A protein has these predicted regions:
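Selective for proline/serine-rich intrinsically disordered segments
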Residues: 1-2, 14
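Low-complexity, intrinsically disordered or signal/transmembrane-proximal segments
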Residues: 3-4, 23
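RNA-interacting cores
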Residues: 10, 14-275
């Protein structure tokens, strides 16, 4: 497929996508789980939940997904203090995943695992969104600061090693890679625009701790917490950055988002003046 560049010079391709009716949609579904009160469920159990999900869908879809190297599902598990329950957030990042996986999640009453069965007390299905809507959301925002919360263990891989601090370049590269995988028709490939984006981003605050994500027999070095990023960008690039941030809660950040890592949420706000 033809790639459309989104850069500092032009967003004109947007109207062309709208005329073509090319709305690639992604969707988020949350399952509120109610484990026994005396059982502590680690976040790494999202990998087991994913195993259950794969067992519920057609083997043909699963095989096709793995053969093509696609990762159309990003998910994570976290505890909600308000609900006093576990929330499994599952993001379906292409139309095939939405059609195949969403009926399984929406009809789930319980999830049997080897150790125990997790009752599903509530299913929340959020409206599907398109790249065009995320871009429009980016256009509507004028905030220059954003706080990214890493809700499940997050890590990057650089030169064959795990990196456990969210540098600006790694964050940007990860968000763009996930965006391009979900929206290949809207791929962000203009190197000049991407370099300008990177130069305008600065981490100005962070509250992080290191952790480990247990995956089979491997303990992956990772981090959790939050970072605040200030964007000093020309308006078209700020729109693009804000669109990527809006997408972060769907596509996740960093490596192994298909296996429960890199769950994220974003808050936008204006810079507080220094008195």
């Amino acid at each position: 497929p033809a790639h459309h560049e989104i850069c500092s010079l032009s967003w004109s391709a947007l109207s062309l996508w709208i005329l073509r009716g090319e709305y690639l949609m992604i969707q988020q579904i949350q399952l509120v789980l109610s484990p026994p009160t005396d059982v502590r469920i680690p976040q790494s159990w999202s990998y087991r939940l994913y195993g259950w999900l794969m067992s519920q869908i057609s083997s043909e879809f699963g095989e096709q997904m793995h053969l093509q190297g696609e990762h159309p599902i990003a998910h994570f598990l976290c505890f909600s203090p308000e609900k006093q329950s576990l929330i499994w957030t599952v993001n379906l990042l292409n139309d095939a995943a939405r059609q195949v996986v969403s009926p399984v999640l929406e009809s789930a009453k319980e999830i049997p695992l080897h150790e125990l069965t997790l009752p599903v007390s509530e299913v929340r299905t959020f409206p599907a969104v398109s790249a065009e809507e995320l871009i429009r959301s980016g256009r509507s925002r004028s905030e220059t600061r954003a706080k990214i919360a890493f809700l499940s263990p997050c890590a990057f891989k650089q030169s064959g090693r795990y990196t456990i601090f969210p540098q600006e370049a790694l964050l940007l590269q990860s968000l763009i890679a996930h965006w391009n995988a979900a929206f290949p028709e809207y791929a962000l490939i203009d190197p000049d625009a991407l370099q300008a984006l990177q130069q305008g981003l600065h981490i100005v605050d962070y509250n992080l701790h290191t952790t480990r994500y247990l995956l089979k027999e491997t303990r992956i070095p990772a981090f959790q917490g939050n970072v605040t990023i200030e964007a000093r960008l020309a308006p078209p690039l700020l729109e693009l950055w804000n669109a990527l941030l809006s997408f972060a809660s769907h596509g996740g950040v960093g490596i192994k988002t298909t296996l429960g890592m890199g769950g994220a949420a974003t808050d936008f706000y204006k810079k507080t003046p220094v008195i």
